[in-house]
């Protein structure tokens, strides 16, 4: 689900000590899931969704940051989630204020061939 209301974003920023960036975002996506049955599978699936969403946002020049949700009861109240659902992660989105988000043109790193081994070490 997507939150864009400034008051709601400010409230959501308090569900975890590292979620302060949510308050200043243009929008925040709440990844909502069924109350976990298989937590490892859920964490994997939501992790994949999170990284793909963040990569797609970067490709569009949109900055993003993720946050955990520590206070589930508070998040459920803020988002008005039905029984059996919980908010797993928050992903804040927005355009950088100081500069356009651009990929590194000349990354300062070793060549791919120097760090990847093929078939054996």
Predicted segments — roles?
Residues 1-46:
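Glycine/small-residue-rich phosphate/adenosyl-binding loop
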Residues 37-40, 88-89, 101:
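A short, structure-level motif marking secondary-structure boundaries and short turns
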């Amino acid at each position: 689900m997507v939150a864009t209301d400034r008051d709601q974003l400010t409230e959501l920023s308090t569900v975890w000590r590292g979620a302060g960036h949510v308050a200043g975002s243009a929008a925040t996506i709440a990844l909502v899931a069924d109350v976990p049955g298989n937590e490892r599978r859920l964490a994997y699936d939501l992790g994949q969704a999170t990284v793909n969403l963040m990569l797609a946002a970067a490709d569009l020049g949109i900055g993003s940051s993720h946050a955990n949700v520590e206070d589930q009861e508070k998040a459920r109240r803020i988002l008005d989630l039905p029984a059996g659902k919980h908010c797993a992660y928050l992903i804040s989105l927005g355009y950088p204020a100081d500069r356009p988000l651009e990929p590194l043109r000349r990354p300062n790193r070793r060549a791919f061939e120097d760090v990847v081994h093929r078939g054996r070490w």
